[in-house]
Amino acid sequence: MRVISQYTAIFFITLTLVGCFFNNSDVQRWEMATQGTTSFALSRDARFGLFFVKEGSNAANTNSEIKSGLHFWDLVDNKELTYFGAQDQHDSTVSHITISDNSRFAITATQTNFAVWDLGMGISEGLWSISDGIIRDVDIASNGQQVLLGLSNGKAIYIDLATGRRLEFLAHREKVNSVALSANGKFALSGGNDHFAYFWDTQTGQILQTFEHEKRVSRIALQRDGKYALTADGGNEAFIWNLKTGDKITELSTFARQQVFSSARFSDDGQYLVTGSPAGTVMLWNTLSGKKQEQWRAEPLKDARPPTAVVYDVAIDKKQRVVSATSAGIAQAWLIE
């Protein structure tokens, strides 16, 4: 009896601590595809969402009416704007989506091909195949003509779709896990399994800054004005850098043995960094101090075991709320206290 009482007390304390660390009272929620999504991107201001639903995903949710394919959603008006359907004739799973900085274009990718979409016109700009590696991450410039791909063969490929120019960045010695392209398409940041992240010129391929980690670099992000960069590895190290000088500004303060990010985005002014994790955690950080200011837990995928959801994307909207988009097919907004 005494042992049971001890375990009860420990369980109660654990729940209390979890309640202290997480604030789960979202102020708005959009349940767009409750059978789950394979990828889900937000626009920079969280006005729009673009997600892909795979037929048969989370089959336990048989009452869902959302169709398989690519969906473009207006979160402010809470309605679907465009149903794009399948990316290719094989109905391949779309695993990566990025919306351009100005919200006009998007790039979506399967393992072997990528498509560019004009979100304003609601049309496809084309489909391109990649044969020399598996696509692991993508980004697109604001004009919709320059794209960046991170591949499993260690290449980061910059392509100008208007001219056909292709630049292969070959500095990485192993898989490229994460890429980011500046809004004007002139600069790129890439991180890979070789423990390095590189900031480089897309016109010349010249390396401008080199950032080294002790473990594989799993997530990177560029601040839109070119002030800062985030590089995070597969352990618990995440650094914010001054892009002009290459100096380390700070390290994100975390007590976890392992802190992996599935998404990351700086606020427009660079004051904050928002991150999402594969376990459904959303966090707000102070860019200069590296201190965590807020933490939330995203709604898990229904009937999933264990109950969790991958945070595919994060953003800060015009109401200064943190917004997340997850594999549960749900977007949530939280107030910044």
Please report, for each region that a protein language model flagged, where it lies by residue.
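WD40-repeat beta-propeller superdomains and closely related acidic/aromatic-rich repeat-like regions
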Residues: 2-7, 14-337
